[in-house]
Design a protein with these regions (language model features):
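Cofactor-/ligand-binding subdomain signature composed of acidic, glycine-rich
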Residues: 1-52
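Histidine-anchored nucleotide/phosphate-binding helix
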Residues: 106-120
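Gly-rich Lys/Arg/Thr-decorated short loops/hinges at beta-loop-alpha junctions or inter-strand turns
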Residues: 27-34, 88-99, 202-207, 249-254
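Hydrophobic alpha-helical positions that pack around
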Residues: 138-264, 276
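Short amphipathic, charge-patterned alpha-helical segments
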Residues: 113-117, 263-281
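Ferredoxin-type iron-sulfur electron-transfer modules in oxidoreductases and energy-metabolism complexes
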Residues: 35-52, 81-83, 89, 98-103, ...
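Short acidic, glycine/serine/threonine-rich loops at helix termini
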Residues: 64, 69-72, 96-99, 138-143, ...
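Conserved phosphate/anionic-ligand binding catalytic regions in large, soluble enzymes, centered on
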Residues: 53-74, 174-186, 190-192, 345-357, ...
Length: 431
């Protein structure tokens, strides 16, 4: 297993990396661009590539888990005008840090994956929208783009073929809302980053009103490995409906926080072993399995759960981006929720009234409980506000703010009640 600045990464996507071998020559030595070269030299049909992705079971790695091959098939192939391909590297959710490592340590995997996607969907222009707060990694990706252009893997008539693809990097300004695909498109167009109503969906009305396909960084980076390994073989790495591997960003109270790539369906207990177990030998109390928007799960339940979309959903949460936040027995759930609710209150774009007003209401109520001024009716009021936000906003940020509130109260109600009754925390030591 490779250690990169205390991050421990296992293949496929980040195989054999040492922190310095991110350049084009290094990537080619590892078999890089062989999938793209084979496609262009053999003239493989775009439909065959999309069929392979469907067979592979690859699902979007950004959070929604939508089947990638199916999404690519939505792009109208015979559209007479410009079409666009967009990568969402606007990684801003607390606990998530996998995509920045991909563009830092293996940027050419992303570039090759996007080029293959462009070929499969008949697209000639693409953009990678990179989160504003990862500036050094943005510069790294720009360097990789220059290398790919100079070597003929990007630009006009790639590798002497009739296929042309121009790929550009765009640096965002750090707004969490721009991780939502239509807000990202608005920002990319130079407008205020606010979500659009859907429908129409980006596949029919996307960037500049043109058909657009948007995928996450890890999703694109997986494509070359799928084609090199074989779609069926990639699928077999995981489990039914959960093909391949997934990078999990584990943080919190573990000995070795970092990025770990494991097959989907791997027991959570195995991931904990890879991360060195609980820090200081403490007991596991709670886990947020898919980024800060995913409902919290009690530690004992999570220890008996597998890491795949269906198993996590059955346990009452969602896999999301694969950002696993582990909390030990000393963590106060009220204070943890206070931090989460403040984040969503600050990051709401303000477009929808339920989210704009509701996130503030939830934050202030949790703040009141945490600081010893809670009232018994606050519990029902918090749930009521969350219920009136969820499903009533243009985008999923409202849901992302509401779900942690409901899950924390459901799974750790006793701590909230103790705070309200005794005016202090149930656990003796907390952040």
């Amino acid at each position: 297993m490779t250690s990169l600045h205390d991050r421990h990464i296992k293949p496929l996507i980040l195989k054999d990396l040492n922190g310095d071998n991110w350049h084009l020559a290094d990537y080619v030595k590892r078999g890089g661009y062989s999938a793209l070269r084979k496609i262009l030299e053999e003239g493989i049909a775009p439909e065959a590539i999309i069929a392979d992705l469907k067979t592979s079971g690859l699902r979007g790695r950004g959070g929604a888990g939508f089947p990638t091959g199916l999404k690519w098939s939505f792009m109208p192939r015979q559209y007479p005008g410009q079409k666009y391909l967009v990568c969402n590297t606007d990684e801003g959710e607390p606990g998530t840090f996998k995509d920045r490592d991909i563009i830092r340590y293996n940027p050419h995997a992303l570039i090759e994956g996007m080029a293959i996607g462009a070929y499969a969907m008949g697209i000639t222009v693409g953009y990678n929208y990179i989160h504003g707060e990862i500036f050094q990694d943005y510069l790294r990706f720009e360097e990789a783009l220059e290398e790919a252009r100079a070597a003929g893997f990007l630009g006009d008539n790639i590798l002497g073929s009739q296929f042309s693809f121009q790929l550009h990097a765009h640096h965002g300004y750090g707004a969490y809302i721009c991780g939502e695909e239509t807000a990202l498109l608005e920002s990319l167009e130079g407008k205020k980053g606010q979500p659009r109503f859907k429908p129409p969906f980006p596949a029919s009305f996307g960037l500049y009103g043109k058909p657009t396909t948007i995928n996450n960084t890890e999703t694109f980076a997986a494509v070359p490995f799928i084609l090199n390994l074989g779609a069926a073989e990639y699928m077999a790495l995981g489990k039914p409906n959960n093909g391949g591997t997934k990078i999990f960003s584990i943080s919190g109270d573990v000995e070795r926080p970092g990025n770990y790539e494991v097959p989907l369906g791997t027991p959570f207990a195995t991931l904990m072993e890879l991360a060195g177990g609980m820090r200081g030998g403490k007991k596991i109390k709670a886990v947020i399995p898919g980024g800060s928007s995913a409902p919290v799960i009690r530690g004992d339940v999570m220890m008996n759960t597998d890491l795949d979309y269906d198993s996590i959903a059955k346990a009452g949460s969602m896999l999301g981006s694969g950002a696993v936040i582990v909390m030990d027995e000393t963590r106060c759930m009220v204070k943890s929720l206070l931090r989460l609710s403040y984040f969503y209150y600050e990051e709401s774009c303000g477009q929808c009234t339920p989210c704009r007003e509701g996130t503030g209401w939830m934050y202030r109520m949790v703040h009141r409980i945490e600081n010893g001024h809670g009232r018994p009716e606050d519990m029902d009021m918090l749930n009521s506000v969350a219920d009136n936000i969820q499903g009533r906003t243009i985008c999923a940020l409202g849901d992302a703010a509401a779900m942690p509130v409901r899950a924390m109260i459901k799974n750790f109600r006793e701590e909230f009640e103790y705070h309200i009754e005794h005016k202090h925390c149930l656990v003796p030591t907390y952040l």
